[in-house]
Amino acid sequence: MAEKIRPNLTFTLLCDDVRQETGGKISLMGIFENVYAAQFPAVHPRLATVNEWAEGRGEFDTTLRILSPDRKSILRETMTRLKLGDARYKHRDISIHLNVEFREPGLYWIENYLDGVLVNSVPLQVILVKEKSFH
């Protein structure tokens, strides 16, 4: 049996949507690092997270949490069982979160765990805007 190798989390991206394309490619729509709202509580209709795991082999449990600014309240949590057969290949774990409610402006956190150990924390700034802006 092959030796178990703990994978590295090479990136975490936040976006509006993810699509699987022909040939195994993925398309990311609306990559962002901030959420803007004119009032609170605010509901973000669709938040997709993309995690890429690489250089690992074996089976692992991953957990993704969206946390409040004080990191005490879990807004969302997803768990996935990773099965990595060969350290040369990458695995992309995609989670879609619908209607995420942000109760107040502030710095929220996306945390990723591998077998119960915190691997990374990604900041998500939720900002109050006075009027709707267009880019």
Regions found by a protein language model. Give the residues of each.
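Contiguous segments within soluble domain cores/interaction surfaces
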Residues: 2-135
